Amino acid sequence: MDLDYNSKDLCIDMYYKNCGLKKPEINLQKECEFKPYFYVDTSEPKEIYDYLDGLNQEIDLKKLEPEFENNTSLKVQDLITNIEIIEKIVYSDYILNGKDISEVSDFKNKKERKICKVYVKYPNHVKIIREYFKEFGKSYEFDIPFLRRYMIDQDIVPSAKYSEDNKIDNSIPELNCIAFDMELYCKKEPNAKKDPIIMVNLFSKDYQKVITYKKFENSEYNGCVDYVKDEKELIQKTIEILKQYDVIYTYNGDNFDFPYLKKRANIYEIELDFDNASNSQQPQIIKISKGGINRKSKIPGIIHIDLYPIARKLLNLTKYKLENVVQELFKINKEAVDYGDIPKMWETEDTTLLRYAYEDALYTYKMGNYFLPLEIMFSRIVNQPLYDTSRMNSSQMVEFLLLKRSFEQNMISPNRPSSSSYRERAKFSYEGGYVREPLKGIQEDIVSLDFMSLYPSILISHNISPETVIYEEKERENMELGIIPKTLNELLSRRKHIKMLLKDKIQKNEFDEEYSRLEHEQKSIKVLANSHYGYLAFPMARWYSDKCAEMVTGLGRKYIQETIEKAEEFGFKVIYADTDGFYAKWDYDKLQKGKKEENDKSDKLSNLPKLSKEELIILTKKFLKGINEELPEGMELEFEGHFKRGLFVTKKKYALIEDDGHIVVKGLEVVRRDWSNIAKDTQQAVIRALLEDGDVNLAKKIIKNTIDNLKKGNIDKNDLLIHTQLTKNIEEYKSTAPHIEVAKKIKQRGDSVRVGDVISYIIVKGSRSISERAELLEYAGDYDINYYIDNQVLPPVIRIMESLGISEDELKNSGKQFKLDQFM
């Protein structure tokens, strides 16, 4: 389940769940034989010792473990416990990586060579000693964290069930999970020195409670409350409950909940000891570490899964507050409460606070259960603990998968770039995927075609990898696959096999536990496979290659453009294309007249015989069969779906309606907070009118009615509120803006505002600047009609309507009636 390094006894603590007992329990097993190491590029250990003797440098004792504190003359070589000569393939020999091509070894004739493996006593000694080796020559794999190194070398599959004879059960293990959240009493920015925890919210299969020390009368949630005496008892009870679980879900628990809990516990001299291992008296103290701008909160023996980085990794949202993620995943509008409002709710015994606290834990639990199976599959594929992979971005997961594959091939991995190399890499830019300007306006009877995993397929079929990219195409075809295409080939072959198994289960109507496991596995493989191309272009990557990235996008453009050309020869008219897919309709004009007439709208499609949806799909699949026979092995164009109607505005901005009425919007969404409800609602209504009914006049009427209602004062002021977040202190803003002026007014009235607050305001009538006319709802007089027409209602819809040939002036004033076929 979990790994931790115990510096006291120089062992790796391995926590696992013994499921063979009547009541499963957590056990601790110690691994003391595995030692830290790194590689030095020499075949003679004596050279290393001679070099270090020549340095005659003493170690900075502050960097070492306590046992060395009294040693006043410790030398670098004293930290080395052993050096052995081994034979390895050194990957860096075969890649450019800043070298001249004449210095690159021939990968076609790759071979192992002798190199020194240097062992040390403590994991942190690796980086210390490596610093002294910079003048000596190349050293490798000095920056792989010790516990992750252990997982790679020992080939341990995490998050899996092992039988007594060491066989792996592929089913997703049953883990006892609980969600943890808390509420504070703070009127300003939370301050752990003075602001108490007033509620802890916990939700699991068998325990759903808000723990607090204040009585709330007449609440429907009273049955979900556990009362304690005070904050000290609340913290103690929280620890006692949490330590009973295998997995703890939080939402931003790394950066907030656990660090705050620890600071409050320190005030009461409570140690956050989550001792849950039945066969050990060893304390399991929470460890809070810092990496970059973020912290990590690790509990030995319990898997802490912070769902915030997972949501950022797997969801494409504008905001990542808990409420936004709940809406995205479960289509539920979860109530939001600003933490500055909680003190008043607490003092007045507002039972809304109980509901809010309870739902925080409930939806964190639901979200955790939603993501857990997928994260378990990531953990297994990458061969790293669940705690670690849940905090990795896609590129980091790809890198550890490649480190694993490199070890399996007896290969020493390349190093990460130095600071100067990183800066050079970050300057590199190249042409991206092919994007074709759309046929603007409304289109009907549309098919969507996409390449299945285009970039991964190109990497495999063209054998593109940092060690192969220096060879010509024909040479690469006859070579052994490089590490990138080889890894991808294994992943995609596995996914193809899984999809066949899933198809079989669907036909047999077997939607069982195995179906769920396979579905999560194929999703995780898809994410990892599609991340390899991005990884190659990531400046911090070990296997970085700008040449590979450039070659892949170039071939991607070639394949999509050639496929579009063949689709149009077949009888389609391509409406829009982007990177790895395109939308098309049947080209009736070309079919009947033998040529395209894109600019001649006199002969309308309604006068020509139309294909039925079924006939169009049959033709589409016939085209796919032919094109896929011509494509390289492993590359496949797929039918993604049929759309009743589509609205195309410009590149990256379009909307479509599926046959079942579901609307897909890309790039047109009004999602920023600084759009009022009236702006969002108007745009959504316009898109729906155009897609559901194909009714341009209705869309125009919706806009005109909104403008008329604004002019008549018939709009609820709540729908005019604009919401903008303060991203820094008021004094730090060099220029003014509406939300800054409102924040100043709030302070002048005696209330507090702080960084992170969302300021909601209305723009009122007047002759002063827009910023000066921004007011809170309760102080707002008549709103500025022209401001809302010109800056809120029209901007989100004007580009849509202009793509249909309707001007801004026509929207503001009464205009002629339109027919749909004028815009096709």
UniProtKB/Swiss-Prot annotation:
Phylogenetic placement of the source organism: Archaea, Methanobacteriati, Methanobacteriota, Methanomada group, Methanococci
PANTHER family: DNA POLYMERASE CATALYTIC SUBUNIT, DNA POLYMERASE DELTA CATALYTIC SUBUNIT
EC identifiers of the protein: 2.7.7.7
Name of the protein described by the UniProt record: DNA polymerase
One Pfam family matching this protein: DNA_pol_B
NCBIfam families recorded: pol2 (TIGR00592)
Catalysis performed (reactions): DNA(n) + a 2'-deoxyribonucleoside 5'-triphosphate = DNA(n+1) + diphosphate
Claim: Transferase is one of the keywords in the record: yes
GO molecular function annotations of the record: DNA binding; DNA-directed DNA polymerase activity; nucleotide binding
Similarity field: Belongs to the DNA polymerase type-B family.
Top-rank taxon, per record: Archaea
Annotated keywords: DNA replication, DNA-binding, DNA-directed DNA polymerase, Nucleotidyltransferase, Transferase
Keyword Iron recorded: no
InterPro entries for the chain: DNA-dir_DNA_pol_B, DNA-dir_DNA_pol_B_CS, DNA-dir_DNA_pol_B_exonuc, DNA-dir_DNA_pol_B_multi_dom, DNA/RNA_pol_sf, DNA_pol_B_thumb, DNA_pol_palm_dom_sf, DNA_pol_type-B
GO terms under biological process: DNA-templated DNA replication
Encoding gene (name): pol
